[in-house]
Amino acid sequence: MFEIKTRDGLARIGIFKTKHGIINTPALLPVINPHLMILEAEEMVKMGAQAFITNSYIIYSDEELRKRALKEGVHSILGFNGPVMTDSGSFQMYMYGISLPPLEMVRFQRDIGSDMGTIVDIFSENADYKEAEREVEETVRRARKSMKEKGDMMLACTVQGGIYPELRKKCARKLARLRAEIYPIGGVVPLMEKQKYADIAEIIIESKKELPPSRPVHLFGAGHPIIFPMAIALGCDLFDSASYIKYAKDDRMIFSDKTLRLAEMEESICNCPVCSSITIDELKEMEKEERIKRIAMHNLWQTFLEIKKVKQAIKQGNLWEVVEQRAYSHPSLLEAMEVIKENKKWLEEWENISKRRAFMYSGRYSIHRPIAYRLQKRIMERYESFFDKSVVFEEMEKPYSRMEYLKKLEANCIVESPFGPIPLELDEIYPVAQSLFPWNIDMETYRESKKLCRRFYKNMEVVGVDEVGKKSKDFDLRKIRSVANYQFGKGAGDALFKGDIKVVKSRTTGKIRNVICNGKHVVSMRASDGFFTLKIEGGKRLHSFFPFPKMRVVVDDDASPFIREGKNVFAKFVIDACREIRPYDEVLIVNENDEFLGVGQCLLNRKEMLDFERGMAVKTREGIKDM
Protein backbone atom coordinates (compact mmCIF):
# COMPACT_ATOMS: atom_id res chain seq x y z
CA MET A 1 0.00 0.00 0.00
CA PHE A 2 2.48 2.69 1.18
CA GLU A 3 6.25 2.36 1.04
CA ILE A 4 9.09 4.78 1.79
CA LYS A 5 11.74 5.09 -0.92
CA THR A 6 13.85 7.88 0.53
CA ARG A 7 13.46 10.37 3.35
CA ASP A 8 14.67 13.42 5.21
CA GLY A 9 13.42 12.91 8.74
CA LEU A 10 9.63 12.69 8.78
CA ALA A 11 9.46 13.88 5.17
CA ARG A 12 9.00 10.85 2.94
CA ILE A 13 9.28 10.25 -0.77
CA GLY A 14 7.13 7.17 -1.13
CA ILE A 15 4.81 5.20 -3.35
CA PHE A 16 1.14 4.79 -2.49
CA LYS A 17 -0.58 2.04 -4.46
CA THR A 18 -4.27 2.32 -5.36
CA LYS A 19 -6.59 0.31 -7.62
CA HIS A 20 -6.09 2.83 -10.40
CA GLY A 21 -2.36 3.37 -10.12
CA ILE A 22 0.48 4.64 -8.00
CA ILE A 23 0.74 8.05 -6.34
CA ASN A 24 4.29 9.21 -5.77
CA THR A 25 4.36 11.16 -2.53
CA PRO A 26 4.43 13.91 -1.45
CA ALA A 27 1.62 14.75 -3.85
CA LEU A 28 -1.03 17.36 -4.49
CA LEU A 29 -4.54 16.28 -5.50
CA PRO A 30 -6.34 19.09 -7.37
CA VAL A 31 -10.02 19.41 -6.49
CA ILE A 32 -12.38 18.86 -9.42
CA ASN A 33 -15.98 20.05 -9.36
CA PRO A 34 -17.87 17.69 -11.71
CA HIS A 35 -20.41 20.47 -12.37
CA LEU A 36 -17.82 22.98 -13.52
CA MET A 37 -14.53 21.75 -14.97
CA ILE A 38 -12.69 24.93 -15.92
CA LEU A 39 -9.58 22.79 -16.38
CA GLU A 40 -9.96 19.25 -17.68
CA ALA A 41 -8.20 16.40 -15.87
CA GLU A 42 -6.08 15.75 -18.95
CA GLU A 43 -4.75 19.32 -18.88
CA MET A 44 -3.82 19.05 -15.22
CA VAL A 45 -2.10 15.69 -15.72
CA LYS A 46 0.24 17.43 -18.19
CA MET A 47 1.11 19.90 -15.42
CA GLY A 48 1.96 17.14 -12.96
CA ALA A 49 -1.28 15.89 -11.42
CA GLN A 50 -1.16 12.18 -10.50
CA ALA A 51 -4.53 11.96 -8.78
CA PHE A 52 -7.62 14.05 -8.13
CA ILE A 53 -10.14 14.61 -5.37
CA THR A 54 -13.80 15.38 -5.90
CA ASN A 55 -16.71 15.97 -3.56
CA SER A 56 -19.02 12.98 -3.36
CA TYR A 57 -21.74 15.16 -1.79
CA ILE A 58 -21.96 17.24 -4.98
CA ILE A 59 -22.44 14.06 -7.00
CA TYR A 60 -24.81 12.53 -4.44
CA SER A 61 -27.07 15.60 -4.24
CA ASP A 62 -27.55 15.85 -8.03
CA GLU A 63 -29.96 13.08 -9.07
CA GLU A 64 -28.80 12.90 -12.68
CA LEU A 65 -25.11 12.97 -11.73
CA ARG A 66 -25.71 10.42 -8.97
CA LYS A 67 -27.33 7.94 -11.36
CA ARG A 68 -24.55 8.40 -13.88
CA ALA A 69 -21.85 7.92 -11.23
CA LEU A 70 -23.48 4.73 -9.96
CA LYS A 71 -23.73 3.41 -13.50
CA GLU A 72 -20.42 4.57 -15.04
CA GLY A 73 -18.24 5.27 -12.00
CA VAL A 74 -16.61 8.43 -10.70
CA HIS A 75 -13.58 8.00 -12.99
CA SER A 76 -15.80 8.27 -16.05
CA ILE A 77 -17.43 11.46 -14.74
CA LEU A 78 -14.05 13.09 -14.21
CA GLY A 79 -12.58 11.78 -17.46
CA PHE A 80 -9.61 10.31 -15.63
CA ASN A 81 -8.58 6.70 -15.23
CA GLY A 82 -5.99 7.22 -12.49
CA PRO A 83 -6.36 7.42 -8.69
CA VAL A 84 -9.42 9.34 -7.50
CA MET A 85 -10.21 10.34 -3.93
CA THR A 86 -13.65 11.46 -2.83
CA ASP A 87 -14.46 13.79 0.04
CA SER A 88 -17.61 13.03 1.98
CA GLY A 89 -19.02 16.55 2.22
CA SER A 90 -18.17 17.12 5.89
CA PHE A 91 -17.00 20.66 5.17
CA GLN A 92 -20.27 21.49 3.38
CA MET A 93 -22.16 20.03 6.34
CA TYR A 94 -20.23 22.40 8.60
CA MET A 95 -20.50 25.47 6.34
CA TYR A 96 -24.13 25.18 5.29
CA GLY A 97 -25.72 23.15 8.07
CA ILE A 98 -26.39 20.18 5.79
CA SER A 99 -27.25 16.86 7.40
CA LEU A 100 -25.56 13.86 5.78
CA PRO A 101 -26.19 10.16 6.48
CA PRO A 102 -22.64 9.05 7.47
CA LEU A 103 -22.76 5.40 6.48
CA GLU A 104 -24.81 6.02 3.35
CA MET A 105 -22.17 8.50 2.14
CA VAL A 106 -19.40 5.94 2.67
CA ARG A 107 -21.40 3.28 0.82
CA PHE A 108 -22.07 5.76 -1.99
CA GLN A 109 -18.37 6.51 -2.39
CA ARG A 110 -17.69 2.78 -2.47
CA ASP A 111 -20.40 2.15 -5.04
CA ILE A 112 -19.21 4.83 -7.48
CA GLY A 113 -15.75 3.24 -7.51
CA SER A 114 -13.75 5.76 -5.52
CA ASP A 115 -10.20 4.57 -4.86
CA MET A 116 -10.06 6.50 -1.60
CA GLY A 117 -13.24 7.43 0.22
CA THR A 118 -13.63 9.62 3.30
CA ILE A 119 -15.72 9.28 6.44
CA VAL A 120 -18.31 11.90 7.38
CA ASP A 121 -16.37 13.46 10.24
CA ILE A 122 -17.47 16.37 12.41
CA PHE A 123 -15.72 19.67 11.82
CA SER A 124 -14.99 21.49 15.11
CA GLU A 125 -13.88 25.06 14.53
CA ASN A 126 -15.41 27.27 17.22
CA ALA A 127 -16.47 24.52 19.62
CA ASP A 128 -15.44 24.70 23.27
CA TYR A 129 -13.42 21.84 24.73
CA LYS A 130 -16.37 19.73 25.92
CA GLU A 131 -18.25 20.10 22.66
CA ALA A 132 -15.13 19.34 20.62
CA GLU A 133 -14.52 16.26 22.77
CA ARG A 134 -18.04 14.99 22.08
CA GLU A 135 -17.52 15.62 18.38
CA VAL A 136 -14.26 13.66 18.45
CA GLU A 137 -16.07 10.71 20.02
CA GLU A 138 -18.75 10.89 17.34
CA THR A 139 -16.15 11.10 14.56
CA VAL A 140 -14.40 8.00 15.93
CA ARG A 141 -17.73 6.17 16.26
CA ARG A 142 -18.58 6.95 12.65
CA ALA A 143 -15.11 5.89 11.49
CA ARG A 144 -15.43 2.56 13.29
CA LYS A 145 -18.77 1.84 11.60
CA SER A 146 -17.56 3.13 8.23
CA MET A 147 -14.67 0.66 8.19
CA LYS A 148 -17.25 -2.13 7.99
CA GLU A 149 -18.94 -0.55 4.97
CA LYS A 150 -15.98 0.41 2.81
CA GLY A 151 -15.52 -2.88 0.97
CA ASP A 152 -12.27 -2.85 -1.00
CA MET A 153 -12.22 0.95 -1.16
CA MET A 154 -9.44 2.62 0.79
CA LEU A 155 -10.89 4.69 3.60
CA ALA A 156 -9.63 8.01 4.93
CA CYS A 157 -10.43 8.47 8.62
CA THR A 158 -10.08 12.15 9.44
CA VAL A 159 -8.44 13.42 12.63
CA GLN A 160 -10.52 16.16 14.23
CA GLY A 161 -10.44 17.93 17.60
CA GLY A 162 -10.52 21.62 16.80
CA ILE A 163 -7.67 23.73 18.14
CA TYR A 164 -7.12 21.46 21.15
CA PRO A 165 -3.84 19.53 20.79
CA GLU A 166 -4.79 16.92 23.40
CA LEU A 167 -8.05 16.20 21.54
CA ARG A 168 -6.18 15.87 18.26
CA LYS A 169 -3.86 13.40 19.94
CA LYS A 170 -6.77 11.49 21.45
CA CYS A 171 -8.64 11.35 18.15
CA ALA A 172 -5.54 10.21 16.26
CA ARG A 173 -4.82 7.51 18.85
CA LYS A 174 -8.32 6.05 18.60
CA LEU A 175 -8.45 6.24 14.81
CA ALA A 176 -5.03 4.60 14.56
CA ARG A 177 -6.46 1.43 16.09
CA LEU A 178 -8.79 1.07 13.10
CA ARG A 179 -5.85 0.66 10.70
CA ALA A 180 -7.47 2.77 7.99
CA GLU A 181 -5.55 3.23 4.75
CA ILE A 182 -5.22 7.05 4.93
CA TYR A 183 -5.32 9.52 7.80
CA PRO A 184 -6.32 13.06 6.85
CA ILE A 185 -5.89 15.88 9.32
CA GLY A 186 -9.04 17.96 9.02
CA GLY A 187 -10.28 21.30 10.22
CA VAL A 188 -7.31 23.33 9.01
CA VAL A 189 -9.00 25.40 6.26
CA PRO A 190 -10.10 28.23 8.62
CA LEU A 191 -6.62 28.21 10.16
CA MET A 192 -5.05 28.44 6.68
CA GLU A 193 -7.34 31.34 5.80
CA LYS A 194 -6.38 33.15 9.01
CA GLN A 195 -2.71 32.20 8.52
CA LYS A 196 -2.51 30.55 11.94
CA TYR A 197 0.46 28.42 10.98
CA ALA A 198 1.59 27.80 14.56
CA ASP A 199 -1.76 26.17 15.32
CA ILE A 200 -1.46 24.07 12.16
CA ALA A 201 2.06 22.96 13.11
CA GLU A 202 0.90 21.91 16.57
CA ILE A 203 -2.11 20.05 15.17
CA ILE A 204 0.07 18.15 12.70
CA ILE A 205 2.65 17.25 15.35
CA GLU A 206 0.16 16.04 17.95
CA SER A 207 -1.70 14.01 15.33
CA LYS A 208 1.47 12.48 13.88
CA LYS A 209 2.63 11.38 17.32
CA GLU A 210 -0.27 8.92 17.45
CA LEU A 211 -0.91 8.00 13.83
CA PRO A 212 0.61 4.81 12.36
CA PRO A 213 3.75 5.74 10.39
CA SER A 214 2.91 3.23 7.66
CA ARG A 215 -0.08 5.29 6.53
CA PRO A 216 0.04 8.45 4.39
CA VAL A 217 -1.18 11.60 6.11
CA HIS A 218 -3.35 14.01 4.14
CA LEU A 219 -3.52 17.66 5.24
CA PHE A 220 -7.07 18.43 4.14
CA GLY A 221 -7.65 21.79 2.49
CA ALA A 222 -4.03 22.98 2.71
CA GLY A 223 -3.49 23.80 -0.93
CA HIS A 224 -1.27 26.87 -0.78
CA PRO A 225 2.42 26.10 -1.42
CA ILE A 226 3.55 28.44 1.36
CA ILE A 227 2.91 25.67 3.88
CA PHE A 228 4.21 22.67 1.91
CA PRO A 229 7.82 22.66 3.19
CA MET A 230 6.77 22.83 6.84
CA ALA A 231 3.89 20.37 6.54
CA ILE A 232 5.96 17.82 4.62
CA ALA A 233 8.86 18.18 7.08
CA LEU A 234 6.37 17.32 9.84
CA GLY A 235 5.21 14.19 8.04
CA CYS A 236 2.33 15.12 5.73
CA ASP A 237 2.27 13.19 2.45
CA LEU A 238 -0.85 14.32 0.59
CA PHE A 239 -2.50 17.69 -0.03
CA ASP A 240 -5.55 18.85 -1.95
CA SER A 241 -6.20 22.20 -3.52
CA ALA A 242 -9.29 24.07 -4.59
CA SER A 243 -7.32 27.30 -4.11
CA TYR A 244 -6.01 27.18 -7.67
CA ILE A 245 -9.48 27.84 -9.06
CA LYS A 246 -10.94 29.72 -6.08
CA TYR A 247 -8.14 32.30 -6.21
CA ALA A 248 -8.31 32.51 -10.01
CA LYS A 249 -11.96 33.55 -9.86
CA ASP A 250 -10.87 36.41 -7.60
CA ASP A 251 -7.94 37.40 -9.88
CA ARG A 252 -5.38 36.23 -7.33
CA MET A 253 -2.13 34.60 -8.38
CA ILE A 254 -0.43 32.01 -6.17
CA PHE A 255 3.32 31.99 -5.66
CA SER A 256 5.41 29.75 -3.45
CA ASP A 257 5.66 32.30 -0.65
CA LYS A 258 2.71 34.62 -1.20
CA THR A 259 -0.46 35.48 -3.10
CA LEU A 260 -0.70 38.60 -5.28
CA ARG A 261 -3.73 40.29 -6.78
CA LEU A 262 -3.48 40.67 -10.53
CA ALA A 263 -4.46 44.35 -10.29
CA GLU A 264 -1.40 45.02 -8.12
CA MET A 265 1.06 43.36 -10.49
CA GLU A 266 3.10 45.47 -12.89
CA GLU A 267 5.65 42.85 -13.94
CA SER A 268 5.53 39.09 -14.48
CA ILE A 269 7.61 37.32 -11.82
CA CYS A 270 6.93 33.80 -13.04
CA ASN A 271 8.35 31.65 -15.84
CA CYS A 272 5.56 29.07 -16.00
CA PRO A 273 4.14 28.28 -19.48
CA VAL A 274 1.23 30.67 -18.86
CA CYS A 275 3.24 33.67 -17.69
CA SER A 276 6.05 33.19 -20.20
CA SER A 277 3.62 33.28 -23.13
CA ILE A 278 1.76 36.51 -22.28
CA THR A 279 2.40 39.79 -20.49
CA ILE A 280 0.70 40.90 -17.30
CA ASP A 281 -1.16 43.60 -19.23
CA GLU A 282 -2.43 41.03 -21.74
CA LEU A 283 -3.63 38.85 -18.87
CA LYS A 284 -5.48 41.80 -17.33
CA GLU A 285 -7.22 42.61 -20.62
CA MET A 286 -8.49 39.07 -21.28
CA GLU A 287 -12.14 38.13 -21.08
CA LYS A 288 -13.06 37.03 -17.56
CA GLU A 289 -13.60 33.35 -18.41
CA GLU A 290 -10.29 32.99 -20.26
CA ARG A 291 -8.45 34.95 -17.57
CA ILE A 292 -9.76 32.64 -14.86
CA LYS A 293 -8.52 29.63 -16.79
CA ARG A 294 -5.07 31.13 -17.37
CA ILE A 295 -4.65 32.14 -13.72
CA ALA A 296 -5.88 28.73 -12.56
CA MET A 297 -3.25 27.10 -14.76
CA HIS A 298 -0.57 29.42 -13.36
CA ASN A 299 -1.68 28.64 -9.82
CA LEU A 300 -1.41 24.91 -10.44
CA TRP A 301 2.01 25.24 -12.08
CA GLN A 302 3.28 27.11 -9.02
CA THR A 303 1.75 24.57 -6.65
CA PHE A 304 3.19 21.54 -8.45
CA LEU A 305 6.56 23.29 -8.75
CA GLU A 306 6.71 23.69 -4.98
CA ILE A 307 6.06 19.97 -4.49
CA LYS A 308 8.95 19.25 -6.87
CA LYS A 309 11.23 21.63 -4.97
CA VAL A 310 10.41 19.93 -1.68
CA LYS A 311 11.07 16.50 -3.21
CA GLN A 312 14.45 17.70 -4.40
CA ALA A 313 15.22 19.00 -0.90
CA ILE A 314 14.27 15.62 0.60
CA LYS A 315 16.61 13.84 -1.80
CA GLN A 316 19.44 16.24 -1.00
CA GLY A 317 18.77 16.21 2.74
CA ASN A 318 18.31 19.94 3.18
CA LEU A 319 14.56 20.23 3.77
CA TRP A 320 14.94 21.92 7.17
CA GLU A 321 16.99 24.62 5.47
CA VAL A 322 14.11 25.18 3.03
CA VAL A 323 11.60 25.25 5.92
CA GLU A 324 13.61 27.90 7.75
CA GLN A 325 14.04 30.04 4.65
CA ARG A 326 10.31 29.85 3.91
CA ALA A 327 9.49 30.82 7.51
CA TYR A 328 10.97 34.26 6.91
CA SER A 329 8.34 34.93 4.23
CA HIS A 330 5.58 35.34 6.84
CA PRO A 331 5.62 36.24 10.57
CA SER A 332 3.08 33.50 11.34
CA LEU A 333 5.45 30.90 9.93
CA LEU A 334 8.09 32.15 12.38
CA GLU A 335 5.58 31.46 15.15
CA ALA A 336 5.23 27.94 13.77
CA MET A 337 9.01 27.54 14.00
CA GLU A 338 8.73 28.09 17.75
CA VAL A 339 6.32 25.15 17.94
CA ILE A 340 8.73 23.01 15.93
CA LYS A 341 11.63 24.05 18.17
CA GLU A 342 9.72 22.83 21.23
CA ASN A 343 9.29 19.42 19.59
CA LYS A 344 12.87 18.81 18.42
CA LYS A 345 13.34 15.92 20.85
CA TRP A 346 10.47 14.02 19.22
CA LEU A 347 11.57 15.01 15.72
CA GLU A 348 15.05 13.62 16.39
CA GLU A 349 13.62 10.08 16.58
CA TRP A 350 12.87 10.26 12.85
CA GLU A 351 15.94 12.20 11.73
CA ASN A 352 18.55 10.69 9.39
CA ILE A 353 21.93 9.92 10.99
CA SER A 354 23.54 12.14 8.32
CA LYS A 355 22.63 13.99 5.13
CA ARG A 356 23.89 14.22 1.57
CA ARG A 357 24.34 17.98 1.79
CA ALA A 358 26.15 20.13 4.29
CA PHE A 359 24.36 21.70 7.25
CA MET A 360 23.76 25.27 6.06
CA TYR A 361 22.99 27.90 8.67
CA SER A 362 20.06 30.11 7.71
CA GLY A 363 19.13 31.82 10.97
CA ARG A 364 18.32 31.41 14.63
CA TYR A 365 16.31 28.21 14.16
CA SER A 366 19.15 26.28 12.51
CA ILE A 367 20.70 25.35 15.86
CA HIS A 368 17.37 23.77 16.86
CA ARG A 369 17.17 21.34 13.94
CA PRO A 370 16.74 17.73 15.08
CA ILE A 371 20.19 16.73 13.86
CA ALA A 372 21.82 19.57 15.83
CA TYR A 373 19.87 18.51 18.93
CA ARG A 374 21.15 14.94 18.47
CA LEU A 375 24.75 16.14 18.13
CA GLN A 376 24.52 18.12 21.34
CA LYS A 377 22.76 15.35 23.25
CA ARG A 378 25.14 12.57 22.21
CA ILE A 379 28.25 14.60 22.95
CA MET A 380 26.89 15.34 26.42
CA GLU A 381 25.97 11.71 27.09
CA ARG A 382 28.52 9.64 25.17
CA TYR A 383 31.81 11.50 25.03
CA GLU A 384 34.47 10.08 27.36
CA SER A 385 37.47 12.19 28.35
CA PHE A 386 40.95 10.79 27.74
CA PHE A 387 42.84 13.25 29.95
CA ASP A 388 42.38 14.90 33.34
CA LYS A 389 42.76 18.37 31.86
CA SER A 390 40.93 20.11 29.03
CA VAL A 391 41.90 23.00 26.77
CA VAL A 392 39.23 25.15 25.11
CA PHE A 393 39.61 26.82 21.70
CA GLU A 394 37.46 29.27 19.80
CA GLU A 395 35.85 28.25 16.50
CA MET A 396 38.44 27.70 13.77
CA GLU A 397 38.73 26.38 10.23
CA LYS A 398 37.35 22.86 9.81
CA PRO A 399 38.29 20.11 10.22
CA TYR A 400 39.92 21.29 13.43
CA SER A 401 42.38 18.40 13.53
CA ARG A 402 44.19 19.76 10.49
CA MET A 403 46.20 21.73 13.04
CA GLU A 404 48.73 19.04 13.88
CA TYR A 405 49.85 20.56 17.16
CA LEU A 406 46.34 20.09 18.62
CA LYS A 407 46.63 16.32 18.18
CA LYS A 408 49.81 16.28 20.26
CA LEU A 409 48.37 18.11 23.27
CA GLU A 410 48.05 15.92 26.35
CA ALA A 411 44.58 17.26 27.07
CA ASN A 412 41.00 17.02 25.88
CA CYS A 413 40.83 19.64 23.13
CA ILE A 414 37.39 21.24 22.93
CA VAL A 415 36.32 23.72 20.25
CA GLU A 416 33.50 26.15 21.05
CA SER A 417 31.51 25.94 17.82
CA PRO A 418 28.06 27.35 17.00
CA PHE A 419 26.76 23.82 17.75
CA GLY A 420 28.28 24.00 21.23
CA PRO A 421 31.33 22.09 22.51
CA ILE A 422 33.00 19.83 19.92
CA PRO A 423 35.77 17.46 21.10
CA LEU A 424 38.64 17.40 18.63
CA GLU A 425 38.16 13.64 18.08
CA LEU A 426 34.66 14.29 16.67
CA ASP A 427 35.58 17.08 14.28
CA GLU A 428 34.89 15.08 11.09
CA ILE A 429 31.45 13.60 11.89
CA TYR A 430 28.25 14.97 10.39
CA PRO A 431 27.25 17.76 10.80
CA VAL A 432 30.39 19.20 12.43
CA ALA A 433 32.77 19.17 9.46
CA GLN A 434 29.94 19.40 6.93
CA SER A 435 28.49 22.71 8.14
CA LEU A 436 28.66 26.35 7.15
CA PHE A 437 28.05 29.19 9.61
CA PRO A 438 28.80 32.91 9.26
CA TRP A 439 31.45 34.25 11.62
CA ASN A 440 28.83 36.53 13.17
CA ILE A 441 26.02 34.23 14.29
CA ASP A 442 22.72 35.40 15.76
CA MET A 443 22.40 36.01 19.48
CA GLU A 444 20.13 33.01 20.16
CA THR A 445 22.62 30.60 18.58
CA TYR A 446 25.48 32.27 20.48
CA ARG A 447 23.68 31.96 23.83
CA GLU A 448 22.66 28.36 23.16
CA SER A 449 26.24 27.46 22.29
CA LYS A 450 27.63 29.10 25.43
CA LYS A 451 25.01 27.41 27.61
CA LEU A 452 25.92 23.99 26.23
CA CYS A 453 29.62 24.68 26.72
CA ARG A 454 29.10 25.60 30.38
CA ARG A 455 27.22 22.34 30.94
CA PHE A 456 29.93 20.34 29.21
CA TYR A 457 32.77 21.86 31.26
CA LYS A 458 30.98 21.32 34.56
CA ASN A 459 33.05 18.26 35.55
CA MET A 460 36.20 19.18 33.64
CA GLU A 461 39.38 20.95 34.67
CA VAL A 462 39.83 23.59 31.98
CA VAL A 463 43.38 24.96 31.72
CA GLY A 464 45.50 27.00 29.34
CA VAL A 465 47.39 25.40 26.47
CA ASP A 466 50.71 26.19 28.15
CA GLU A 467 49.78 24.04 31.15
CA VAL A 468 49.70 20.70 29.30
CA GLY A 469 52.25 18.46 27.63
CA LYS A 470 52.64 18.26 23.87
CA LYS A 471 53.84 14.70 23.26
CA SER A 472 50.64 12.72 22.74
CA LYS A 473 50.93 10.17 19.91
CA ASP A 474 47.66 8.24 20.00
CA PHE A 475 45.18 10.71 18.44
CA ASP A 476 43.94 8.23 15.81
CA LEU A 477 43.04 5.70 18.51
CA ARG A 478 41.25 8.36 20.52
CA LYS A 479 39.40 9.43 17.40
CA ILE A 480 38.09 6.01 16.39
CA ARG A 481 36.99 5.25 19.96
CA SER A 482 35.19 8.59 20.28
CA VAL A 483 33.40 8.19 16.94
CA ALA A 484 32.32 4.64 17.88
CA ASN A 485 30.97 5.82 21.25
CA TYR A 486 29.08 8.67 19.60
CA GLN A 487 27.67 6.51 16.81
CA PHE A 488 26.92 3.23 18.61
CA GLY A 489 26.85 4.03 22.33
CA LYS A 490 29.13 4.38 25.31
CA GLY A 491 31.71 1.60 25.52
CA ALA A 492 31.53 0.75 21.81
CA GLY A 493 35.01 2.12 21.19
CA ASP A 494 36.64 -0.21 23.70
CA ALA A 495 34.55 -3.16 22.51
CA LEU A 496 35.45 -2.67 18.86
CA PHE A 497 39.08 -1.68 19.11
CA LYS A 498 41.00 -4.06 21.32
CA GLY A 499 44.01 -6.18 20.47
CA ASP A 500 46.49 -5.38 17.72
CA ILE A 501 45.00 -2.30 16.01
CA LYS A 502 45.97 -1.08 12.55
CA VAL A 503 44.52 2.19 11.27
CA VAL A 504 44.55 2.35 7.46
CA LYS A 505 44.52 5.83 5.93
CA SER A 506 43.91 7.23 2.45
CA ARG A 507 47.15 7.94 0.62
CA THR A 508 45.72 11.07 -0.96
CA THR A 509 43.78 12.69 1.92
CA GLY A 510 45.43 11.14 4.95
CA LYS A 511 42.00 10.42 6.44
CA ILE A 512 41.12 7.19 8.22
CA ARG A 513 39.53 4.64 5.90
CA ASN A 514 39.65 1.23 7.63
CA VAL A 515 40.41 -0.21 11.05
CA ILE A 516 41.92 -3.70 11.33
CA CYS A 517 41.95 -5.50 14.69
CA ASN A 518 43.98 -8.71 15.14
CA GLY A 519 44.15 -8.99 11.36
CA LYS A 520 40.36 -8.68 10.86
CA HIS A 521 38.54 -5.80 9.20
CA VAL A 522 36.26 -4.31 11.88
CA VAL A 523 34.96 -1.03 10.43
CA SER A 524 35.40 1.38 7.54
CA MET A 525 35.12 5.13 8.00
CA ARG A 526 32.97 6.92 5.44
CA ALA A 527 34.53 10.00 3.85
CA SER A 528 31.10 11.58 3.36
CA ASP A 529 30.02 11.86 7.01
CA GLY A 530 32.89 10.62 9.19
CA PHE A 531 30.86 7.69 10.54
CA PHE A 532 31.66 3.99 10.50
CA THR A 533 30.30 1.27 8.26
CA LEU A 534 30.19 -1.97 10.22
CA LYS A 535 31.87 -5.12 8.94
CA ILE A 536 30.89 -8.59 10.15
CA GLU A 537 33.76 -8.72 12.66
CA GLY A 538 32.74 -5.36 14.07
CA GLY A 539 29.15 -6.54 14.31
CA LYS A 540 30.24 -9.64 16.23
CA ARG A 541 32.15 -7.55 18.73
CA LEU A 542 29.28 -5.15 19.35
CA HIS A 543 26.81 -8.03 19.55
CA SER A 544 28.92 -9.63 22.27
CA PHE A 545 29.34 -6.35 24.15
CA PHE A 546 25.91 -4.72 24.07
CA PRO A 547 23.01 -6.43 25.88
CA PHE A 548 19.81 -7.19 23.98
CA PRO A 549 18.13 -5.25 22.34
CA LYS A 550 20.80 -2.55 21.92
CA MET A 551 21.51 -1.90 18.20
CA ARG A 552 19.42 -4.96 17.21
CA VAL A 553 16.84 -5.49 14.52
CA VAL A 554 15.07 -8.77 15.35
CA VAL A 555 13.72 -10.74 12.39
CA ASP A 556 11.34 -13.66 12.10
CA ASP A 557 13.10 -17.03 12.23
CA ASP A 558 11.73 -17.81 8.76
CA ALA A 559 13.73 -14.88 7.36
CA SER A 560 16.98 -15.84 9.11
CA PRO A 561 18.44 -18.05 6.33
CA PHE A 562 17.99 -15.26 3.78
CA ILE A 563 19.68 -12.68 6.02
CA ARG A 564 22.66 -14.99 6.50
CA GLU A 565 23.01 -15.05 2.71
CA GLY A 566 23.08 -11.25 2.59
CA LYS A 567 19.46 -10.63 1.55
CA ASN A 568 17.81 -7.40 2.69
CA VAL A 569 15.41 -7.20 5.64
CA PHE A 570 11.83 -6.27 4.77
CA ALA A 571 9.62 -4.58 7.34
CA LYS A 572 7.04 -7.36 7.44
CA PHE A 573 9.68 -9.74 8.85
CA VAL A 574 10.79 -7.44 11.69
CA ILE A 575 9.59 -8.58 15.12
CA ASP A 576 11.33 -5.97 17.27
CA ALA A 577 14.14 -3.43 17.22
CA CYS A 578 16.16 -1.18 19.50
CA ARG A 579 14.35 2.06 20.40
CA GLU A 580 17.54 4.07 19.85
CA ILE A 581 17.83 3.13 16.17
CA ARG A 582 17.54 6.08 13.81
CA PRO A 583 17.12 6.13 10.00
CA TYR A 584 20.33 5.12 8.19
CA ASP A 585 21.97 3.81 11.37
CA GLU A 586 24.28 0.79 11.27
CA VAL A 587 22.45 -2.12 12.93
CA LEU A 588 22.95 -5.70 14.09
CA ILE A 589 20.50 -8.17 12.55
CA VAL A 590 19.52 -11.04 14.87
CA ASN A 591 16.87 -13.75 15.10
CA GLU A 592 14.34 -14.30 17.88
CA ASN A 593 17.00 -16.02 20.02
CA ASP A 594 19.43 -13.10 19.58
CA GLU A 595 21.66 -15.15 17.28
CA PHE A 596 23.78 -12.80 15.19
CA LEU A 597 22.88 -12.95 11.48
CA GLY A 598 24.52 -9.94 9.88
CA VAL A 599 25.07 -6.19 9.74
CA GLY A 600 23.26 -3.57 7.72
CA GLN A 601 22.01 -0.03 7.38
CA CYS A 602 18.40 0.65 8.31
CA LEU A 603 15.97 2.90 6.46
CA LEU A 604 13.38 3.03 9.24
CA ASN A 605 13.30 3.59 12.98
CA ARG A 606 11.76 1.07 15.37
CA LYS A 607 8.20 2.43 15.23
CA GLU A 608 8.24 2.32 11.46
CA MET A 609 9.76 -1.16 11.22
CA LEU A 610 7.03 -2.58 13.43
CA ASP A 611 4.23 -0.76 11.62
CA PHE A 612 5.06 -1.01 7.92
CA GLU A 613 3.80 -4.00 5.95
CA ARG A 614 5.74 -3.13 2.80
CA GLY A 615 9.21 -2.02 1.87
CA MET A 616 12.76 -2.43 3.06
CA ALA A 617 13.65 -1.97 6.72
CA VAL A 618 17.37 -2.77 6.57
CA LYS A 619 19.79 -2.94 3.66
CA THR A 620 21.98 -5.89 4.64
CA ARG A 621 25.68 -5.16 4.14
CA GLU A 622 26.99 -8.62 5.09
CA GLY A 623 25.37 -11.82 6.27
CA ILE A 624 27.16 -14.27 8.54
CA LYS A 625 27.71 -16.61 5.55
CA ASP A 626 29.26 -13.82 3.48
CA MET A 627 32.54 -13.95 5.42
PLM region descriptions:
Residues 1-151, 359-384, 393-447:
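Non-catalytic, usually N-terminal nucleic-acid engagement modules in DNA/RNA processing proteins
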Residues 242-335, 448, 490:
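Gly/Ser/Thr/Ala-enriched C-terminal appendages of enzymes
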Residues 333, 337-373:
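Flexible, glycine-rich loop/tail regions that form catalytic "lids" or insertion modules at the edges
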Residues 376-429, 500-548:
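Polyanion-binding interface signature
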Residues 460-527:
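N-terminal intrinsically disordered, low-complexity, charge/repeat-rich segments that act as generic
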Residues 487-502, 518-583, 587-627:
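Beta-strand/loop-dominated core regions that host nucleotide or nucleotide-derived cofactor-binding catalytic loops
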